[in-house]
């Protein structure tokens, strides 16, 4: 019975994580619910599963459920782009720049020198609003200006006017994740890398 309860709780937690990543997956009862509540519910169900596991002293079954839970909940986050932070846009961009043989510390994302590296998912097309001014219709994008010519530019990267702040070891990780992928590959490489890292840590803690 405890194993069945834990399995159900893990499935519910994974479903809540998936819904928090992509609101379009929400059933009618959860549609419109604030994403913070979804995350809280996911934590509560995962925590409840952990509590039941602590009471169930069957090591083999417990180990399998911990690994399965880590995989299920981590996979749930892959159904959509990150919603709580746009930092991964900078991670991906730094990896793309490094992969082109350019130091990510040399130029900010808005620099014209890097214009040939910009994928559309990180730099969506600029539109002209009803007032005749440039606008960024893509959700999550912000309007900035290319330097030095001042051309309007939309980007998903925060603080695009300044070079990266991430240290060399982090840059090595970003470059490694993006190394074998085309620039057009969007959010999922960093998400998958994060999931694999999480599973590795889980396995190390169990061993």
Tell where the protein language model's regions lie, with residue ranges.
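Start-transfer (signal-anchor) and selected internal transmembrane alpha helices
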Residues: 1-14, 18-79
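Alpha-helical transmembrane signal-anchor/signal-peptide segments
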Residues: 84-96
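Short acidic, glycine/Ser/Thr-rich loop/turn "cap" segments at secondary-structure junctions
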Residues: 73-83, 153-161
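Interfacial juxtamembrane loops and adjacent helix segments
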Residues: 98-187
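Transmembrane-helix motifs of polytopic, lipid-linked glycan transferases
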Residues: 46-55, 176, 188-207
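Membrane-interface anchor segments at the N-terminal boundary of transmembrane helices
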Residues: 29-40, 182-199
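Alpha-helical transmembrane segments of multipass membrane proteins
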Residues: 73, 77, 170, 198-201
């Amino acid at each position: 019975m405890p194993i069945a309860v834990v399995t159900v709780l893990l499935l519910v937690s994974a479903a809540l994580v998936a819904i928090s990543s992509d609101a379009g997956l929400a059933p009618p009862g959860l549609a419109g619910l604030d994403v913070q509540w979804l995350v809280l519910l996911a934590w509560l169900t995962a925590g409840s599963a952990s509590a039941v596991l602590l009471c169930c002293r069957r090591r083999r079954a417990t180990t399998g459920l911990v690994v399965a839970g880590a995989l299920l909940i981590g996979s749930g986050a892959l159904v959509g782009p990150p919603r709580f932070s746009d930092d991964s846009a900078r991670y991906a961009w730094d990896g793309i720049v490094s992969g082109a043989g350019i130091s990510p510390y040399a130029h900010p994302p808005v620099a014209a020198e890097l214009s040939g590296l910009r994928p559309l998912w990180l730099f969506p097309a600029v539109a002209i609003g009803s007032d005749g001014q440039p606008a960024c219709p893509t959700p999550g994008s912000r309007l900035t200006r290319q330097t030095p010519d001042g051309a309007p530019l939309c980007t998903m990267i925060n603080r695009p006017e300044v070079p990266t702040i991430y240290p060399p070891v982090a840059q090595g990780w970003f470059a490694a994740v993006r190394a074998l992928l085309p620039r057009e590959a969007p959010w999922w490489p960093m998400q998958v890398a994060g999931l694999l890292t999480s599973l590795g840590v889980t396995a190390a803690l169990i061993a």
